[in-house]
Amino acid sequence: MLLLMTAIPAARPAAQQGPVFRAGVEFVNLGVTVTDRKGKLISDLTADDFEVLEDGRPQTVRFFASSASPAPELHLGLLLDISGSMEGRMRDAREAATHVLSSLDVARDEAAIFTFDTRLDEVQPFAKGVQTLPDSLSALTPFGATSLHDAIARTAERLAAREGLRRAVIVFTDGNDNASRLTPEEVSGIASAIDVPVYIVGIVAAIDNPASDISVVKVENSALAGALTNLATWTGGRVAIASTSADRSMLAREIVGELRHQYFITFESSGRPGWHPLAVRARGKDLTVRARSGYIAGQSRPSPQ
């Protein structure tokens, strides 16, 4: 998200409050996930541990927040593929989505549930305390073509209107798309510009995934590789295959944990209109840092409170 504001020094530490701004200058907010070589979340870094590059040039961090300040609420859009290619996989998709919902804090976190084939339908509006899927989803028969890319873009736009920093689209799909108007590159640009990471949970049968003896395997299913993996990565999210019940349970906890332990970094934009590539690094540390790949200047929206 972009903020048309100017930072004002505050009396309390940044870790205990959000940034204070006044109109005039455009600021950019980044959600950042950090893991070690084994994939373990790293949640004890400080602002000095990060380097932010815009257009290849270092930027000054104006505001920094970790997951410890304060306990963060999540805003999730769960997106279930109900197109014809999901025949025989809907039970697994429902199970994976239910695991995500059961990992949420009923008092703080909010979620909405969407389904799609060639159109997007909201079956559960955004609300706190959503722990189960609507009963209507149990009787659904997968049918029709698939507009996966379009559905992701529209769900990300719904998330952008929610107040709060920790937002994400979580997609449950086999990865096939045969009817979208948007390309994966266009979708990643939309989601990156509004700072909504996209997580894609690949619902594949064991026969589709020879490495299914590994808990959550690398993406080897062709429909989930390449452009779709790039789509998720460029937004700061990722793709993972869930071919067993244990996979689905573990992956749900991982995704919710990642979002809960994100860092948030705000820096001043260069102000030049157009697309600006971004990179975030951990100084002098052998860590993996995930954040959106860029933003579009001149498309600011109000800061979430």
Task: Describe every region a protein language model picked out.
Residues 11-305:
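Scaffold/interface architecture of coatomer-like assemblies
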Residues 1-9:
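Bacterial N-terminal signal peptides
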